[in-house]
């Protein structure tokens, strides 16, 4: 098995694409409030937190399976196609992966959304597992965001 790879996952949710995309854009405020077990804080260290070049420091809660802190830089945002890419630039994850770049795309589908997530990585050593735990955490978060948004709609 090589040191580099890519993981992909698709998740269908009931929330409309526009609503889900807005929630992702407000993750700095929304995630620690709505999902305190997963996110303790998200601080903006540079930029506005959403534009390319922005840097965010994420302190994870007990629900995070791999790391407790990471810094990520927003690499690209495509508002029209509801897509954003980020790179991990600091924190414990760099002990396992020399590089990690994630991409999230929100696509309208049948009144809900199709979420596509991919993670490109380069491991620090052959013994390191592929980051399936990170992929699974992303899927869990997508489902939690959907549940949260659906509760807000029905409230």
Curated annotation (Swiss-Prot):
GO terms for cellular component: cytosol; nucleus. It holds the Pfam family Bet_v_1. GO terms for biological process: abscisic acid-activated signaling pathway; defense response. One of its GO terms (molecular function) is protein phosphatase inhibitor activity. Belongs to the MLP family. This is MLP-like protein 423. It comes from Arabidopsis thaliana (Mouse-ear cress). The gene is MLP423.
């Amino acid at each position: 098995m090589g040191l580099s790879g890519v993981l992909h996952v698709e998740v269908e949710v009931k929330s409309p694409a526009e609503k889900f995309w807005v929630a992702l854009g407000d993750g700095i405020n929304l995630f620690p409030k709505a999902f305190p077990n997963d996110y303790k804080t998200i601080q903006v260290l540079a930029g506005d937190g959403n534009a390319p070049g922005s840097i965010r420091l994420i302190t994870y809660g007990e629900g995070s399976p791999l790391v407790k802190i990471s810094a990520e830089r927003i690499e690209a945002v495509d508002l029209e196609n509801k897509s954003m890419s980020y790179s991990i630039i600091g924190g414990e994850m760099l002990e396992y992966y020399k590089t990690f770049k994630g991409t999230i795309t929100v696509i309208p589908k049948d009144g809900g959304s199709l979420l596509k997530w991919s993670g490109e990585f380069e491991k620090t050593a052959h013994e390191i597992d592929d980051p399936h735990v990170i992929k699974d955490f992303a899927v869990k978060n997508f489902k939690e965001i959907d549940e949260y948004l659906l509760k807000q709609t029905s409230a």
